[in-house]
A protein has these predicted regions:
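Karyopherin-beta/Importin-beta family HEAT-repeat alpha-solenoid scaffold
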Residues: 2-985
Length: 985
């Protein structure tokens, strides 16, 4: 019966496998995946045996075996550790190890896949082991691989050793994350001897190239074993000599020989291993001795080329600094690969990052940077890797793709595959070094000055590039030298007559450099001169239709406006209008979201810095068209995706955002929304404000919109600014906005704090009649949220909304608020620590303080008494008073303390029944305490009493409402002061 069931299961699995392998029906594939998961959970051993049988069958097509491996790997990732018994794990691990080592020459991709199965099984199996020993599963794999590798080495079987090294490489790659218990280090230690034995098969450079595959996997294993797992000084010296032998032949292989490519690839891995040693073992590098890095007699030598023949026994050439400088100084492409140069550059950068923590490393670097090698080395880095491409083809890109050309000046410093990026990192590390800054700066300035004097376009762009990125590391406290360079050399080049005669490549770098060094220009006169020059560049570039120069000049202008030295007196009279006209023209022409984001950022900075104050409504019209274009584009794409996708399935926002630079587009939309908000703060038209509701706010906050998932936080921020900046509630759109925000309060999503702030702000804007828009059901839900939410931000926002309801209520909602507040306070088990109690106490205080007379206060008191009585017998009126007194001890401000004291007084005065003497005495002492200290805060605020007394009442009110960032000129600020005036007295 069991065998029959197993057979049925295998047949079912085969059918599911075929669907997953070949079907293009998405629904069918999902159903098959779900059924397979169910079978795997119920009968994991049957699944493992069935897939193993297929993978082990040499009669099955290789692609089918490969597909089965993929299924097994997915199962191992999800279920191996918990769903498969230990005995079964051990059996299948042993089976797969035997399979790997038994098959002589499997297809390389299949061999890699099966070896990954072995690695995952060992990694995800039981990790229990004796102290200092490897887990049994891992030990078994290591022992099997090492034994097989030693047999292949002894037999000098290159083919067999190559396969075993492949298996070992995959295993080491998977194990390198197993650092707990030093598992990875233990695996690497077991590999030291067998790997050393394999190196004996390759005694010469010729042997390495002839046995390229063997050597490649040997280097890959060495990368993890010696570069990341085990520090072995003897190996480091041996491997350096081997690397020199490879480098010595660069550029000497016949053009049609495969050896050239083989040599470069092996050199890349060798350099990667040397780099890893520095990164993983910086504190042990002293064990290598200084001669490993730099030799004393190198000072008089010139920088060699990697293509220069060298003897393996020529000791001076065996220092690693000479090797790396030789690689860096060789022609890229013709002699060395870009990847090899990047790794050589990163080796130096990694050493420099460790110099502060290791005196030996610092000493090695000092020796090198003070040697005769260093200055030519640094000059080559600047001239070869920091120069712009200045060919006619490059210039044609200025008109074809101007936005990409302008953006290309901002190099990705994290790109480890770009020589320019790696050269920038090393240049900055050298000139910013603790131990080597002196000689590095001297060499850097000498190099750039020489390149500038050459006068050729390429070298000049390289020099300007180096100076530009060195705005921090090359700057000094005495800025007179740079200012002289700025006044005497740079600014004259920005004159329109000179620009017309200057290479566009040089002009672009000059404009860029001026912006990069903005922090070194501190005087108003100089800053004004620079901004005037940049304005002139803008006018010239617009006239000559040089979009690249326009974009670079705008970026440099932004640098000056955004830096800490900026003042309004820096701004030339016409600069702002020139910038706005230029931005407006560009926004209608550019296509790159990154460019739009940059332009929006510039205007945003101008607004935030105060350079634009009275043009808010005009700025809205500047940013609205591109914002609408992005929104319309995403709505259209969502509609198309929905039309072509499977029926009944919603559009995946991630898929839309990832397609065709979508995330970048939405990033620019976020910036445009911020700019719209900044503009509204300086506008004065309610019509302009509420015109954004249907075309921007609704499509960017609707749960069904394609853009919402990406921009809703900025959209709700903009919505809040709209409400704060509006002056009246007369616009029909304002009423629509309030209803829309109220509907969103019923959702459970991350924007709720902003939603409630919008509701609170709009209720204050509406001023009265809260009952017309807010229902008792709304209030019930808000009270529940306030009591149950763990988010302080959400509690603050909900509290502000309830304050607004209480202040604008005609009576019924205010009474309901008082009832809820009184009940919650009476029933609180720890009134001082629960975050909702203080807001609810202030709801009571505000309601009584806002009452127009004694009769209205008496009516509220009736509701409070009824609420307390509904809590009987656990809650009493006396307990309510006690809870309020306890809250005084944790009051956050003088304003709150005084409000609570007045609340206690009115509750005592309006009590339906005479209070006990103890209660009266308790309240009296609390009120006297508030009066004696001016209502100062308790120590929980972190401020002393004197500081608390000095705080202005409006400041404390804004803090209570969560409106600390509201400027005094905002219409919302004035409304808050009027609405809550009762708390200010």
């Amino acid at each position: 019966m069991h065998a029959n069931t197993s057979g049925v299961t295998r047949s079912t699995m085969d059918a599911l496998f075929e669907v997953l392998r070949s079907s293009v029906d998405n629904a069918a594939r999902k159903q098959a995946a779900a059924q397979l998961r169910d079978l795997q959970e119920r009968e994991p051993e049957v699944f493992l045996q069935h897939t193993y049988d297929g993978i082990a069958s040499q009669q099955l097509q290789a692609e089918l075996r490969f597909f089965l491996c993929t299924l097994v790997i997915a199962f191992l990732d999800e279920s191996w550790h918990n769903a498969v018994p230990k005995e079964t794990q051990e059996r299948f691990l042993e089976s797969y190890v035997r399979l790997l080592l038994a098959e002589a020459n499997p297809p390389i991709l299949l061999a890699r896949k099966v070896s990954r199965i072995v690695a995952l099984m060992a990694k995800r199996g039981s990790r229990r082991a004796q102290l200092g020993a490897l887990p049994l599963a891992i030990q078994h794999v290591v022992t099997s691989y090492v034994s097989e590798l030693e047999k292949a080495t002894a037999a000098q079987s290159h083919a067999r050793a190559t396969y075993v090294l492949l298996y070992l490489h995959v295993f080491l790659k998977e194990m390198q994350g197993c650092r707990i218990g030093n598992v990875f280090e233990g695996v690497c230690r077991a590999c030291v001897a067998p790997l050393s034995g394999v190196f004996s098969l390759l005694p010469s450079e010729t042997g390495m190239l002839e046995a390229h595959d063997l050597c490649l996997y040997l280097f890959k294993c060495s990368l993890r074993t010696f570069g990341r797992g085990v520090f072995d000084p003897a190996f480091c010296h041996f491997f350096l000599a081997a690397t020199w032998r490879l480098a010595a032949g660069l550029g000497q292989d016949a053009p049609d020989s495969p050896n050239a490519e083989r040599r470069q690839r092996l050199l890349e891995y060798a350099l990667k291993t040397h780099e890893a040693t520095v990164v993983f073992f910086p504190s042990r590098l002293h064990e290598l001795g200084i001669s490993f890095f730099v030799l004393a007699d190198e000072a008089a030598a010139a920088v060699p080329s990697a293509s220069t023949p060298s003897s393996a026994h020529d000791t001076p050439e065996h220092s690693i600094f000479r090797l790396l400088s030789a690689v860096v100084s060789s022609p890229v492409g013709d002699v060395v690969s870009e990847k090899a140069v990047c790794r050589a550059l990163r080796f130096f950068t990694s050493l420099l990052s460790a110099e502060d923590g290791d005196a030996f490393i610092a000493h090695c670097l000092q020796c090198y940077t003070t040697s005769m090698y260093f200055a030519p080395f640094l000059q080559h880095i600047v001239s070869a890797y920091l120069a712009d491409t200045t060919t006619p083809e490059a210039l044609s890109e200025w008109s074809r793709h101007p936005e990409q050309v302008a953006a290309g000046l901002d190099v990705d410093m994290d790109d480890e595959t770009s020589t320019m990026s790696c050269a920038e990192q090393l240049f900055l590390a050298l000139t910013g070094s603790t131990a080597c800054a002196g000689p590095s700066l001297a060499a850097a300035w000498a190099a750039v000055n020489q390149l500038l004097q050459e006068g050729d376009v390429g070298p000049v762009t390289a020099a300007l590039h180096a100076i530009g990125i060195g705005y921090y590391t090359m700057a000094s406290e005495d800025t007179s030298s740079y200012l002289g360079f700025l006044r005497g050399k740079l600014l004259p080049l920005l004159d329109p007559a000179t620009l017309a005669q200057t290479s566009p490549f040089v002009a672009r770098r000059v404009v860029w450099l001026v912006g990069m060094w903005c922090e070194s220009v501190t005087g108003t006169e100089d800053r004004r001169a620079v901004l005037s020059a940049l304005e002139t560049v803008l006018q010239h570039a617009v006239a000559t239709q040089s979009v690249v120069l326009v974009l670079v000049a705008l970026k440099s202008t932004e640098n000056f406006v955004s830096d800490n030295h900026f003042t309004l007196s820096d701004v030339p009279p016409t600069m702002v209008n020139t910038v706005l006209r230029t931005v407006q023209e560009l926004l209608s022409r550019v296509q790159s979201p990154t460019t739009i984001k940059g332009l929006a950022g510039l205007v945003h900075v101008l607004v935030e810095k105060g350079a634009l104050q009275s043009q808010g409504d005009a700025l809205v019209q500047l940013f609205l068209p591109p914002a609408l274009a992005v929104i319309e584009s995403y709505e259209s794409r969502a509609a198309n995706a929905g039309g072509t996708g499977a029926s009944g399935l919603g559009v995946d926002a991630d898929e839309i955002g990832d397609d065709e630079g979508g995330a970048d587009s939405l990033s620019s939309l976020n910036m445009l929304l911020e700019c719209l908000g900044s503009s509204l703060r300086h506008g004065d038209s309610d019509a302009v404000i509420w015109s954004l509701l249907p075309c921007v706010i609704v499509p960017c906050t609707s749960p069904t919109s394609a853009a919402t998932a990406w921009v809703e936080d900025n959209a709700w921020e903009l919505f809040l600014v709209m409400a704060q900046s509006s002056r009246t509630f007369f616009s029909p759109a304002a009423a629509e906005a309030l209803q829309m925000a109220l509907q969103h309060t019923t959702r459970d999503f991350g924007m709720l704090p902003l939603v409630f702030r919008v509701v609170y702000t709009l209720l204050l804007l509406r001023q009265d009649g809260a009952e017309e828009v807010v229902s008792p059901a709304h209030l019930e839900a808000w009270m529940t949220m306030l009591r149950e939410s763990l988010s302080a931000e959400l509690c603050s926002a909900v509290a502000a909304a309830t304050f607004a309801v209480g202040r604008t209520s005609a009576g019924p909602l205010s009474a309901l608020l008082c009832q809820h507040a009184a009940q919650a306070l009476v029933l609180s088990s720890d009134v001082q620590s629960e975050q909702y109690t203080m807001p609810l106490a202030m709801v009571l205080a505000l309601s009584f303080a806002s009452a127009t007379g004694g009769e209205e206060q008496q009516q509220l008191a009736v509701h409070v008494h009824a609420a307390v009585q509904s809590c009987a017998p656990s809650g009493t009126y006396s307990q309510l008073l006690e809870q309020l007194v306890l809250l005084l001890d944790v009051s956050p401000s003088t304003l709150v303390s005084r409000a609570l004291a007045r609340l206690l007084e009115v509750l005592c005065r309006t009590s339906a029944a005479p209070l006990a003497g103890d209660d009266l005495a308790m309240v009296q002492r609390a009120m006297e305490g508030v009066a004696a200290t001016g209502g100062s805060t308790a120590s929980v605020t972190g401020a002393d009493d004197e500081d608390a007394e000095d705080r202005a009442a409006p400041e404390m009110l804004l803090e209570l409402l969560g409106d600390e960032d509201i400027p005094q000129g905002s219409p919302h600020f004035a409304r808050v002061m009027r609405a809550f005036a009762a708390l200010l007295s």
